[in-house]
């Protein structure tokens, strides 16, 4: 076997391999012997068919199969010998084959980039310092009450957290536009669902009033024909409602799994959940900064084959989220996923190098802790932990999470880490 390797472009490689004619003939004869032992031909007993008849009937197909097998095996031998690490599936380009002559073919593929990590000492990471305060717990209790609130119609003017039922008709330069009209539209104030100025124009009005508000569509608005345009909305305010928050009764509290129904028990449970969320948020915030710094400090080439593979993964995930099938997934435009796919590949390659250079392996105690932390959010944590322990795929996924965290910590060990005090709400809003 003769082998030559050349660089085509960037990470592209072409391996050219020549297989000696006698090697091909030896392999063909060997395979024909195997075929002769199995075939049945009228007039002959099984295994007793003369080789010339076997060769006449099966020679062409056997030779084709043998060539394919030799191409594959010789390519594998070549990349092992040349210490080449292909990324993605190779493309075989067969040359012209002539009976009794050496056979030359080429294989084109991409290789993984050679990554030499640099700039880790210059990475800057800001670690949030946060405590869950009594005021934070009070705020979460208010949120829980709002989620369980009922609505009561009122006669007064619209206020910041009321709910309104309206008819509206929008126009630009006196012309109504598509999507600018609705009847019996229910709008909860303060949630930012409408364009700036819309809710402000409704506040202070009462049910039964009809009025017009002036707004301007944002420059980044999704509809091209409305970007930056001044508009008028004719409003018919049909109903105003205010929230009625439930009292913290034993019955209400027990809905959240606090068996004794006490306010103290609910506060303790809420605080525990908030502290679990906080721990995860801090960890994710620090890890994301470390990874972002790693990416900025290391500009690497990325094999197109890996990006294509990641795009397919993202397509399928998107299709599953929206109830699509495999065919619909592959029809989604690759442009929607290209940037995200490239970043995921870059991060994977860089973290892989961190793991390799630091000889990291998933810490089983960390894996156990991650599973327990995740399971604590469920009604029966023991059941969730047991389910994970019996599912190899889930356990492997959690080991990958642990290994990624360990890699991020290895980056952090060399980075410039500063601490910054912040609040629970500020941190959680950054995560959103």
Swiss-Prot record:
Record's keyword terms, sorted: Cell cycle, Cell division, Chaperone, Cytoplasm, Isomerase, Rotamase
Keyword match ATP-binding: no
Annotated PROSITE patterns: FKBP_PPIASE
Superkingdom of the organism of origin: Bacteria
Gene Ontology CC, one term: cytoplasm
Pfam families per the UniProt record, alphabetical: FKBP_C, Trigger_C, Trigger_N
Name of the top EC class for this enzyme: isomerase
Cellular localization per UniProt: Cytoplasm
Primary location class: cytoplasm
EC numbers, comma separated: 5.2.1.8
InterPro entries per record: PPIase_dom_sf, PPIase_FKBP_dom, Trig_fac, Trigger_fac_C, Trigger_fac_C_sf, Trigger_fac_ribosome-bd_bac, Trigger_fac_ribosome-bd_sf, Trigger_fact/SurA_dom_sf
GO molecular function, a single term: peptidyl-prolyl cis-trans isomerase activity
Record text on subunit structure and interactions: Homodimer and monomer. In vivo most of the ribosomes are in complex with monomeric TF. Uncomplexed TF, however, is in a monomer-dimer equilibrium with approximately two thirds of TF existing in a dimeric state.
Protein purpose: Involved in protein export. Acts as a chaperone by maintaining the newly synthesized protein in an open conformation. Functions as a peptidyl-prolyl cis-trans isomerase.
Protein name per UniProt: Trigger factor
